[in-house]
């Protein structure tokens, strides 16, 4: 069930002051059942308000104030479903879309690495998600926990309009906006049913059951985990200010102009983290159920310790423990151990002493797992102007010029995988992680740009106008996040546009259409690189033909048609690596399995059909197994992915063809009018990947909608009904990938199923 309510009230406070308040709410029950909990999810709970106040200070001065606020607090997911073909090397095979809502194979992901270090496996990394419960039904999913979605936005604008004279008007504006966004998702998209056998299984210990906390202190939760699982958290806060002052002319002659100054100041803190049971236990051994067992076994309390160095040492101690305990038992019974047993016991004692000598570490919950954290400030200033010249009564020329001063200051935090760099840099000694020496990179991108516009419009008849324009623009560069905060360049765009706006057939046809070409230099495309999204610059060309036509077949019958035909491709020979498929091959011919000396699966390998051998650790790629240990913040010394050319590829997420058609019929009556409208919408196939891999193909989308409404002659109210997606076909309309560290699982959004409802509105 869904309820959508809107309303507005005009309030004439005085002869010179008037106000208007508007509100809206959108509530909907969940459309998807979480089979694991029995709860409904994917609901809606939105509320918004808007207040405007206009004050006529005098005959030439007006002050306008506007405030709007919006809040969403529900359990909608970021995407409806996931896809994966489990693969022991990649996590998810990059060569096929795979099955709906399958989890990646742990052996090819950071989840498996975290689990191994966190003592969840008895000796080697296994695919503990292999028997997980999953669903291929849109309406029924398996999730350990329903998602949470919270967003709050506020925006205020103050505008002063002053008529300086009959010919000149001054407009000054100031606006301020804020946004807070928090989203939590079940990242693995399944309910894992495999117990966490644990590294202590050889000592006769039962499977691990742990009380684990995820997220942050202000945005997270704690739960009891009997199996491994992964959650992701997006936490974004930003605010922006805009200032603008301009002068607009209204001369009687052929020349007019507008000129002004604009400033923009934007600040954001964007955090994204992925956490598993293993990552959270690694942060503090005091949270691990093995802590009291180890204390009893060794006579040493390690509950104050944590982090990768401690856990890796503890793995060695646990491996040595059965033999050491046997030797100690023999000595207690008066038996003489062998020399090898005595040496092993001595080594065991040294290992325990080494662990005890490590400094105490308790990694904060929000630093455990993977964390991408960027603080960005964007500042820009611009001087601009446009001049308008009426060449004659039917022809107008527009000339524009804009000067921009663009700046991007970015601070990127890099605490390392599992906070390994944070520990090594002395992070526990600092209250604020941003103050830890060596863990933040501060970089500034500054540039200036001059752009322009030239346009001409010509009335061929009173109701037929053609135009042509050429416009250039620049978007500033910035810094990528994650463990490789490399800069990306500015983006320059030049657009040429030819169009027609006309009323034809004595006003029975309204027609707007245009042909355009965008020439983009340095267009930003998002790719995947290890634990984060990574922007690259490419040159691209976009050519399109779009239009809108409305035809009145009679006084009571009309049709509407819109269309967009686009050819969009990458034109530069930009070469970059595909971290989801680093070899540039078409398949794997041999899985090498664990290739680390102890056969733990800490490092795995595979031979590809192009003859290359690649290695992975925690989902990270490398062309060599040597000097490669992401868990210790030691990343690949050689190539992480073969560079491939993107030239000739289609731009991601751009459909070649899209159009809509609507038929409207009016049925006039003595007391009012009934209108019936049937609409059809079509969007063609597209691909969501800069590398155009087939698993990112998005099929064509089609839908029929129907609207029936009755409005009385006085127009004071209306009543109607609607039905959307009459055929009840759900289509994928977006797809993206998780990182290679997450196994490259795909996340897809789909159109809503068929829905219908009643509408009613009134003015009073």
Go through each PLM region and give its residues.
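Transmembrane beta-strands of outer-membrane beta-barrel pores
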Residues: 25-29, 69-73, 176-180, 263-267, ...
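Solvent-exposed loop segments that connect transmembrane elements
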Residues: 31-40, 77-142, 188-231, 275-371, ...
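Membrane-embedded beta-barrel scaffold of Gram-negative outer-membrane proteins
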Residues: 159-165, 169-175, 182-185, 459-475, ...
């Amino acid at each position: 069930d869904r309820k959508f309510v809107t309303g507005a009230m005009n309030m004439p406070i005085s002869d010179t002051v008037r106000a208007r308040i508007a509100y809206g709410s959108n509530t909907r029950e969940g459309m998807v059942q979480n089979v694991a909990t029995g709860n409904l999810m994917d609901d809606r709970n939105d509320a918004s308000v808007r207040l405007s106040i206009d004050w006529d200070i005098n005959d030439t001065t007006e002050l306008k104030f506007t405030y709007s606020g919006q809040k969403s607090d529900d359990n909608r997911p970021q995407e409806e479903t996931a896809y994966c073909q489990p693969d022991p090397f990649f996590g998810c095979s990059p060569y096929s879309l795979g099955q709906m809502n399958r989890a990646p194979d742990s052996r090819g992901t950071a989840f498996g690495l975290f689990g191994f270090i966190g003592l969840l496996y008895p000796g080697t990394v296994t695919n503990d998600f292999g028997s997980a419960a999953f669903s291929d039904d849109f309406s029924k999913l398996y999730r350990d926990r329903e998602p949470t979605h919270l967003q709050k936005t506020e925006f205020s604008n103050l505008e002063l309009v002053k008529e300086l004279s009959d010919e000149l008007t001054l407009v000054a504006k100031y606006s301020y906006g804020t946004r807070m966004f928090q989203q939590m998702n079940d990242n693995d998209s399944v309910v894992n049913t495999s117990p966490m056998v644990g590294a202590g299984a050889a000592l006769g210990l039962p499977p691990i059951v742990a009380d684990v906390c995820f997220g942050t202190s202000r945005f997270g939760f704690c739960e009891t985990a009997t199996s491994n699982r992964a959650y992701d958290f997006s936490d974004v806060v930003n605010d922006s200010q805009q200032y603008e002052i301009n002068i607009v002319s209204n001369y009687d002659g052929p020349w007019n102009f507008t000129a002004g100054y604009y400033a923009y100041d934007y600040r954001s803190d964007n955090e994204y983290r992925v956490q598993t049971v293993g990552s959270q236990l690694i942060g503090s051994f005091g949270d691990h159920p093995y802590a009291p067992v180890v204390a009893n076994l060794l006579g040493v309390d390690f509950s104050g310790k944590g982090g990768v160095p401690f856990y890796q040492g503890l793995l060695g101690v646990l491996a040595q423990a059965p033999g050491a305990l046997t030797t100690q038992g023999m000595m207690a019974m008066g038996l003489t151990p062998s020399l090898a047993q005595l040496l092993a016991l001595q080594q065991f004692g040294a290992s325990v002493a080494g662990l005890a000598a490590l400094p105490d570490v308790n990694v904060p919950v929000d630093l455990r797992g993977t964390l991408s954290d960027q603080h960005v400030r964007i500042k820009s200033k611009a001087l601009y102007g446009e001049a308008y010249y009426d060449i004659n009564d039917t022809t107008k020329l527009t000339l524009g010029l804009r000067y921009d001063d663009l700046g991007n200051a970015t601070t990127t935090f890099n605490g390392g995988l599992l906070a390994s760099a944070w520990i090594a840099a002395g992070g526990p000694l600092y209250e604020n992680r941003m103050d830890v020496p060596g863990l933040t990179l501060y970089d500034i991108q500054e540039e200036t740009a001059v752009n322009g516009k030239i346009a001409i419009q010509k009335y061929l008849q009173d109701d037929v106008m053609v135009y042509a324009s050429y416009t250039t623009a620049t978007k500033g560069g910035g810094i990528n996040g994650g463990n490789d905060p490399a800069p990306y360049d500015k983006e320059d765009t030049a657009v040429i546009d030819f169009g027609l706006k006309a009323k034809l057939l004595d006003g029975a046809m309204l027609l707007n259409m245009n042909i355009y070409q965008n020439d983009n230099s340095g267009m930003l495309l998002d790719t995947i690189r290890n634990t984060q999204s990574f922007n690259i610059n490419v040159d691209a060309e976009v050519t399109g033909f779009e239009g809108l036509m409305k035809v009145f077949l009679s006084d009571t019958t009309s049709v509407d048609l819109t269309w967009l035909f686009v050819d969009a491709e990458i034109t530069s020979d930009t070469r970059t690596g595909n971290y989801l498929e680093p070899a540039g091959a078409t398949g794997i011919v041999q899985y090498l399995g664990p290739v680390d000396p102890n056969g733990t699966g800490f490092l795995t390998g595979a031979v590809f059909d192009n003859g290359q051998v690649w290695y992975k650790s925690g989902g990270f790629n490398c062309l060599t197994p040597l000097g490669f240990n992401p868990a210790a913040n030691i990343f690949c010394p050689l190539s992480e992915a073969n560079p491939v050319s993107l030239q000739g590829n289609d731009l991601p997420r751009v459909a070649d063809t899209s159009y809509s058609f609507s038929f409207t019929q009016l049925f006039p009556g003595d007391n009012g009018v009934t209108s019936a409208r049937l609409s059809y919408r079509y969007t063609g196939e597209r691909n969501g990947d800069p590398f155009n891999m087939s698993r990112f193909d998005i099929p064509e989308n089609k839908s029929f909608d129907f609207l029936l409404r009755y409005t009385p002659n006085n127009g004071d109210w209306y009543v109607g009904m609607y039905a959307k997606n009459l055929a009840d076909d759900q289509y994928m309309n977006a797809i993206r990938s998780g990182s290679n560290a997450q196994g490259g699982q795909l996340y897809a959004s789909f159109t809503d199923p068929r829905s219908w409802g009643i509408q009613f509105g009134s003015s009073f």
